[in-house]
C-alpha cells in the first residue's frame, strides 16, 4: 500500500496552511519536497497569529497576560533578577477560576493578604480545553487557615473560586537532561528567548554567570546553557515548556522526559523570529472593509447600512456618526501591535499547535521510515493478508 502516494494526492500547500498545527522542515520535505519551508512558515504565521488574536482578545485571561502592562513588566523584572528555586513558605491553590474573571480582580484580592510572599496565575491549554489555577505562596511562618479565611472574605463569592492548602513537600529543583550535542539547539533557543523578551543576550548571560559565583564554569557547554534557560527564563530544555513561576516548573518537571512532541517544540523555538513582518491593518483599510460598493456612485455603510454617492461622503459619515466604532478599530490595531511584541512560549504553543503532545495526523505515516501503516479496513476485508 503506497501510503505516501495517497497522502501526496490529498495534501497541498493550501491544505497545510489551513491547519492549526505547524509542521517541521523534515515533515514538509516528505509531503511537498519542492515547497520552500521558509515561505510555508511565514505564511502559516501570517494566517494563524491574527486568528489566535481575534479569537481571544476579548477574553480576560488574554487581556491580563498580553494586553495589560502589569504581567509583562513583572516578568521582565523577574528575568533580570534570575529565578531562585528556594521555597520556604506554605502554599495555597485557588481552583475553579473562570477565564472570564479579570486578572486585576484576582491580583487585587490576593495582594491584600499580609502573609503573601508571591502568587501567580497558571494558564493551561490542552486537547480538553483551557483552564486557570492560582498558586499562592505564603511567608514562612504564616498560618495557612487564617490566610485562606482572609482571602475568602475579600473574594466575591459569586466567582466560585475554591481555596485549599497545597502540599509542596518533596518538590525539588528540576534536573535538566542534556548532552554535548544539544549545545547548538540550546544556544539557539536561548537567543530566541532573549529576542522574545527583548533582553540583551550577552548581559543576561554575564549576570547569570556572576550569580553562579563560579568563574570557571564553561559557558560554551550544553549543560551551562540549559541551566541558564532554566534559571533565566524558567524554560525546561527536556520537556520544552516555559513556566511562569519556579514552583510551577518544579511541579511540571517532576517526571519529565524528552519526547517527539518536545523535540518539535525545541525545533520551532530554536528558529523563532520576531513577527515584525506580519501585516497590521491600518484604520483606513479596516474602514474600507466596512464599505460595500454596490455599483458606481453607490456606497453602503457596513455599520448602519446607509447609502452614499461617493467615498468622500461615506468616510465623512464614518467620522461623524461612528466615532465609537472607529475608536474600537483603533484600539484593536493598538492591541494587536502589543500582542505581537509580547508573544511568549505559552501562546506560541497555541499558534503552532504544540500546546498538547499530539502529532498532526496527516504526517504520522511519514515520521519514521521504518514504520508500517496498515489500512485496517482493508486488512479486515481480506484485501491484505498478514503472514506469520
UniProtKB/Swiss-Prot annotation:
Keywords: Metal-binding, Zinc, Zinc-finger. InterPro entries: Znf_C2H2_type. A zinc finger (C2H2-type) spans 299-322. One of its GO terms (molecular function) is zinc ion binding. It comes from the Eukaryota. This is Zinc finger C2H2 protein ECU10_0150.
